[in-house]
């Protein structure tokens, strides 16, 4: 507990982080995004009104919250402009409260072209990216040919960087992937225009965070995707292109390890996954379809149906361990209402042996067969319940079992999409 809290996904993403971030941003100094791009879709429902954010921190709907985008985030100019415009049209003040690190890399048109052409060429072996250029933008960052926010304000340098990048990427696009080249002049002009647009928002995010900590202000670090999609610790190669784990909050903003006081891991009461990759507890039957329908399990960014399955404690314990999770938030408990029985994977059968540890590669995960523990379901309606004692006995027993099996206390339970459909058992900021 303390003044700086990291909120991150403890599964494969889509756990409901946006709502929880919004809930915790009352009396907040700042909310900061530290990795990913506009492939994240954070859905907020406040008083019945739905808002989907892809790039801007979820705290933007709090009038007094400062919203920061750190150096670890890759920024699509078009996506940022669109999101700012939509929020401002809805009466939300954005540009005076949004601060963006000059070290944040840009997603350029050639990154999008590469992403989409590669996925198409891969066919059945595609990773299942959103096709929005996230991965190629991170590739350029590591290869030191990326274009960052800071570069937009030095036209001669920008021109040189862009020509070098296009010489490389257009060769790959035309000669290897067989698609059209990206035009230099159009890309250059658009980049310059975005430089003018973003200039008032360009700020030293790390410096702001250090100052806020000195002032004793609350800061919330908002993760995107989930721990099991981490480029290093996830089901590689079926992962995202950034560090979605707690280390990403440090490297992606410029703060030290002592700046983090509490790590809140978000997990659904069951499990979902989008795109390719191993998913040991996946349900390819009417039970899985029922969960998908009741939980509206379709991507906020892409609309793709999510794969659904039982809670996987082996995977959850891995997320708890690699992130040093202080407390869990279990979301979508109400989706399980009316189910006669529930299953929880407590171990895997892997190459003839039982193990409680997940393999470190996708092929190993594919070979795992879940070992289940069965729990009674409940017929009562839990939707919108905000008091622990009012939950059905079976629901409370299920949550306590998850807590014990994961070896981590449950701090928050969500029983519906609205901000108010939540019970806080332990305030991370208390």
From Swiss-Prot:
It is an enzyme of class 6 (ligase). The active site is at 14 (proton acceptor), 42 (proton donor). SUPFAM superfamilies: P-loop containing nucleoside triphosphate hydrolases. Its main location: cytoplasm. GO terms for molecular function: adenylosuccinate synthase activity; GTP binding; magnesium ion binding. InterPro entries: Adenylosuccin_syn_GTP-bd (IPR018220), Adenylosuccin_syn_Lys_AS (IPR033128), Adenylosuccinate_synth_dom1 (IPR042109), Adenylosuccinate_synth_dom2 (IPR042110), Adenylosuccinate_synth_dom3 (IPR042111), Adenylosuccinate_synthetase (IPR001114), P-loop_NTPase (IPR027417). It catalyses: IMP + L-aspartate + GTP = N(6)-(1,2-dicarboxyethyl)-AMP + GDP + phosphate + 2 H(+). GTP binds at residues 13-19, 41-43, 306, 332-334, 414-416. GO terms for biological process: 'de novo' AMP biosynthetic process; IMP metabolic process. Its cofactor is Mg(2+). Its EC number is 6.3.4.4. Pathway: Purine metabolism; AMP biosynthesis via de novo pathway; AMP from IMP: step 1/2. Pfam families: Adenylsucc_synt (PF00709). GO terms for cellular component: cytoplasm. Keywords: Cytoplasm, GTP-binding, Ligase, Magnesium, Metal-binding, Nucleotide-binding, Purine biosynthesis. It is found in: Cytoplasm. Binds 1 Mg(2+) ion per subunit. Substrate binds at residues 300-306. Belongs to the adenylosuccinate synthetase family. Homodimer. This is Adenylosuccinate synthetase. It comes from Xanthomonas oryzae pv. oryzae (strain PXO99A). The gene is purA.
């Amino acid at each position: 507990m303390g003044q700086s809290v990291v909120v991150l996904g403890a599964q494969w993403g889509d756990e409901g982080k946006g709502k929880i971030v919004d809930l915790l941003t009352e009396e907040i100094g700042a909310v900061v995004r530290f990795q990913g791009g506009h492939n994240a879709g954070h859905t907020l429902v406040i008083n019945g009104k739905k808002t989907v954010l892809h790039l801007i921190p979820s705290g933007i709907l709090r009038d007094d919250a400062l919203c920061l985008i750190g150096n670890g985030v890759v920024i699509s100019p078009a996506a940022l402009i669109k999101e700012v415009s939509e929020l401002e049209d809805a009466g939300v003040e954005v540009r005076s409260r949004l601060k963006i690190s000059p070290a944040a890399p840009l997603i350029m048109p050639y990154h999008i072209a590469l992403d989409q052409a590669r996925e198409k060429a891969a066919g059945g072996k595609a990773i299942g990216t959103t096709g929005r250029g996230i991965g190629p933008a991170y590739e350029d960052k590591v290869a030191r040919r990326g274009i960052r926010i800071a570069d937009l304000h030095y036209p001669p340098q920008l021109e040189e960087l862009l020509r070098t990048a296009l010489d490389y990427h257009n060769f790959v696009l035309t000669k290897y992937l067989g698609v059209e080249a990206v035009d230099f002049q159009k890309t250059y002009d658009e980049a310059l225009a975005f430089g003018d647009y973003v200039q008032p928002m360009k700020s030293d995010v790390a410096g702001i965070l250090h100052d806020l900590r000195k002032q004793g202000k609350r800061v919330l670090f908002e993760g995107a995707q989930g721990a099991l999609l981490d480029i290093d610790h996830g089901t590689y190669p079926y992962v995202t292109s950034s560090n979605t784990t707690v280390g990403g909050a440090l490297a992606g903003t410029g703060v030290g390890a002592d700046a983090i006081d509490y790590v809140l891991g978000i997990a659904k009461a069951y499990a979902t996954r989008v795109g390719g990759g191993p998913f040991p507890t996946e349900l390819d039957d009417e039970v899985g379809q029922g969960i998908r329908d009741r939980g509206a399990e379709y991507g906020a960014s892409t609309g793709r149906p999510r794969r659904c399955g039982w809670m996987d404690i082996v995977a959850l314990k891995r997320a708890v361990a690699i992130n040093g999770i202080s407390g869990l938030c279990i979301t979508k408990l109400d989706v399980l209402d009316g189910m006669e029985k529930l299953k929880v994977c407590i171990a895997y059968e892997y190459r003839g042996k039982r193990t409680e540890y997940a393999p470190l590669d996708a092929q190993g995960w594919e070979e795992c067969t879940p070992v289940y523990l069965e729990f009674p379901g409940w017929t009562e309606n839990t939707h919108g319940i905000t008091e622990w004692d009012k939950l059905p006995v079976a629901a409370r027993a299920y949550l306590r079992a998850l807590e014990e099996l994961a070896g981590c206390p449950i701090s928050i339970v969500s029983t519906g999409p609205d901000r108010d459909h939540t019970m806080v058992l332990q305030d991370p900021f208390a």
